[in-house]
Amino acid sequence: MKSVGNLSPNTSLLFICDIQSKFENHIFKFNDVVGQSKYMIKICNELKVPIIFTEQYPKGLGHTVEDLLKERNENNQTKIFEKTLYSMCTNEVLNHLKQNHKDLKSILITGIETHVCVLQSTLDFLENGYDVHILSDAVSSNNNNDRLIALERMRQSGAFITTTETITFQLTKDAKHKSFKNIVPLSQERREYLLANPSLSSLSKL
């Protein structure tokens, strides 16, 4: 049976793709990508969903923005991989997944650029048998047109195009979830921020 994209914290992992300082002035709604990714990191820390950061040629392009790195939690598994391949699905990453996350089924992706590294990562992870969920409000490109076309391209290949809040409630499933009281304020804070900054909501538009 074809996967319908259900999620469980025990079989999911969040990838933060190349959100590096040198890209700040070259990516459409870069700050929105950072903000939504930061929210997702907090959610994953609360639910103990492991997190992998990738960095594209950090020697020349700098490291992941500090605003995201400071959200790393010693109580949750976090790993950083450097790469030159556009795809995050490097041999090093695949070996890490096979050795340390044997029950992994669902890969969640935020980051940049949607039509390059995010797209190629998605295709490679799909070919390796994983479900891939693209958080559309947390990915971007140099321009929105490339982003939109890439989202449709990934959908055609079998990825699930979704949002950070949708993922949040898919992972928790029940208002009786033990982390519900901690997650609700994070979700409310996100909603209030978007209401106060309506221009930032454009990444939610497909």
Curated annotation (Swiss-Prot):
It comes from the Eukaryota. InterPro entries: Isochorismatase-like_dom, Isochorismatase-like_sf, Isochorismatase_domain. Signal peptide: none annotated. Belongs to the isochorismatase family. This is Isochorismatase family protein 1A. It comes from Dictyostelium discoideum. The lineage of its organism: Eukaryota, Amoebozoa, Evosea, Eumycetozoa, Dictyostelia.
